[in-house]
Amino acid sequence: MKKYLLYASLLTSVLLFSCSKNNPSEPVEDRSIEISIRVDDFTKTGETVRYERNQGSAAERLITNLYLLLFDQSGANPAKYYIAGNTFSGGIWLPDDMKVKLDMTQSEAGERKVYVVANVDNAVKTALDAVANESDLQTVKRTTAMPWSTDIASPFLMSGNKTHDFLANRLLDNVPLVRAIAKVELNISLSEKFQIVPIIVNGSLSEFKFRYVNFDKETYVVKPTTKPDNLISSANGVWPQITDWTVWGASLNTSPAPDAGTGYTLDANGKVTALRIVTYLNERDSKGATVEVALPRVDDGTLPPPEFGPELYRLPLPDKILRNHWYKYEVEI
């Protein structure tokens, strides 16, 4: 009888212990939340280049500041954090780990629509300060009067977003930051009829010129469903009026070469055999963006003027220019 009583007592103790351990009324640990980020790779593509990924240079991945917006489930009432150093009001930023630790707890956060914006200037910050709803982000933009390199340059505006339940997991991992700009690279191999011995002034090829046509001025934090055009060209002159076009420079001939600019190759006889141009630009939803190049022909004396004068090469860019895409072209003229 004593044995049965002992077994019953032990069984009751085990049941009581199990019930107390699984009691839903027991408080769950409420910890501060964390958000980790990464810079997304470029999508590299073009007429002669297969689809691939490219992480870009250190300058193209640079982050100088962050702006966090944590909207509630309805896309309203955002908690906002501007981060310009390792410590800020509401948390700390660990750049080596690409992680933000906030003072906000899991219960305070709950489920959130999280947006991370990087490299904001004063105008963009002021606009973000006024954002009240998720949809407002599509109106926040940066305007560049001359929207090509070198005016569009590192550090680049980036953004990324995810929806996350912080009650289930206090860490929101790997929010991808996508550059809000695109990149165009044009490598031109010249045939013999364009291989002249150039006049070089301060490193630039006087006879070779180019212009950007119908580039968009606006860089949006979050792209509108249909982006409206605000276009400009780098020169007003339309072929064959090329007086105000840009002469071909040699910035890409330096070492180390910058990520964008112009460059060229000379052979042993001093003739131009190749041209290269790399520029950043804004996304576009409508076609019409073009790179135009004026190429001088070799004057062999067989044709009267102006037949042996410069010729026009026109590179139409894609009908839609997508952010964070690197369009690379290898052409022979």
UniProtKB/Swiss-Prot annotation:
Lipid-binding residues (covalent, N-palmitoyl cysteine): C19
Subcellular location as annotated: Fimbrium; Cell outer membrane
Pfam family, one: MfA4_C
Keyword Cell membrane (UniProt): no
Lipid addition sites, S-diacylglycerol cysteine: C19
Propeptide part(s) removed at maturation, as residue ranges: 19-53
Predominant location: other
Site for Cleavage, residues: R53, N54
Note in the entry: The name (minor fimbrium subunit) does not indicate the abundance of the protein, but is derived from the greater length of the major fimbriae. In strain ATCC 33277 and strain ATCC BAA-1703 / FDC 381, major fimbriae are 300 - 1600 nM in length and about 5 nm in diameter. In contrast, minor fimbriae are only about 80 - 120 nm long. This length difference is observed only in a small number of strains, including strain ATCC 33277 and strain ATCC BAA-1703 / FDC 381, and is due to a loss of function mutation in FimB, a protein that restricts fimbrial length in other strains.
Protein's name according to its UniProt entry: Minor fimbrium tip subunit MfA4
